[in-house]
Amino acid sequence: MAYPGYGGGFGNFSIQVPGMQMGQPVPETGPAILLDGYSGPAYSDTYSSAGDSVYTYFSAVAGQDGEVDAEELQRCLTQSGINGTYSPFSLETCRIMIAMLDRDHTGKMGFNAFKELWAALNAWKENFMTVDQDGSGTVEHHELRQAIGLMGYRLSPQTLTTIVKRYSKNGRIFFDDYVACCVKLRALTDFFRKRDHLQQGSANFIYDDFLQGTMAI
């Protein structure tokens, strides 16, 4: 297997949307979209904002500017119960969630970005539950390898070991840390992908560009 590899969209697993049960596939809306030459299905927004529960959660904490900062996002996600039986997301995880989708560099998140995050979180949660076969509420090294593979990424054993050491506690990765890993993996891959003009797994960029792209996550 060649390294490195790139995942597409949120991975090859179903995305939960309001009105659908966890695990129910999203109806097909057309062929898979190739993202800048990288394989994998692209995410598409499959529901409207008007009157749905996602908007209710968001608007309950959003400021007058219609956006949320990290503390407001943390409160919103906790109140929504999206984490299920797992511990609520930490403030640091909420910060990098915002950074992942902060395309206008405001340090906040509007509703469209929140919908995108909501879909990603449900997909990552389903993926976590799929690989947590013993129901321990954590994933181990081999389960994380499976989860990352399901998302379409092809990582070297050395990189996977580095990720496990970074996000695990006594060899086990809890849901909040797992989501933080997914956020960073997606954000850094997107950052690199935009600069890999030939789509060959290599890119050149200046030091300041590198710092701007990585220090925000």
Curated annotation (Swiss-Prot):
It is found in: Cytoplasm; Cytoplasmic granule membrane. Residues 48-83, 89-122, 119-154, 155-180 form the EF-hand domain. GO terms for biological process: membrane fusion. Detected in neutrophils and macrophages (at protein level). Highly expressed in bone marrow. Calcium-binding protein that may play a role in the adhesion of neutrophils to fibronectin. May play a role in the formation of focal adhesions. Homodimer. Interacts with SRI and LCP1. PANTHER family: CALPAIN, SMALL SUBUNIT 1 A-RELATED, GRANCALCIN. This is Grancalcin. The gene is GCA.
